[in-house]
């Protein structure tokens, strides 16, 4: 009888959501940097490094510094976050 190990895990594929300059460099509530941007994320369960079953498929705001993430469903939610960010920047003292 032979023993064949089954290697399984998770693999994520991130891609840019868009290249609009207003959607980049948003404020991160976790690390307090202006580095958050929207991404499209696909996460799969893998066996032998082959993606088989999709676990997550959606859009997120992502900070590459601290790896903070927040889901958003559509452009309306994204624009609401951007509007709130602009309000924060206007209220900051110089």
UniProtKB/Swiss-Prot annotation:
It is found in: Cell membrane. It is a peripheral membrane protein. Present with 996 molecules/cell in log phase SD medium. This is UPF0768 protein YBL029C-A. Belongs to the UPF0768 family. One of its GO terms (cellular component) is plasma membrane. It comes from the Eukaryota. Keywords: Cell membrane, Membrane. Its main location: membrane. The keyword Repeat does not apply.
């Amino acid at each position: 009888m032979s023993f064949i190990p089954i290697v399984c895990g998770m693999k994520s594929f991130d891609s840019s959501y868009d290249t609009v300059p207003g959607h980049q460099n948003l404020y991160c509530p976790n690390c307090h940097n202006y580095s958050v941007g929207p991404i499209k994320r696909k996460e799969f369960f893998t066996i032998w490094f082959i993606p088989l079953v999709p676990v997550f498929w959606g859009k997120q705001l992502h900070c590459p510094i601290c790896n903070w993430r927040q889901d958003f469903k559509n452009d309306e939610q994204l624009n609401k976050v951007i509007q709130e960010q602009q309000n924060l920047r206007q209220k900051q003292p110089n």
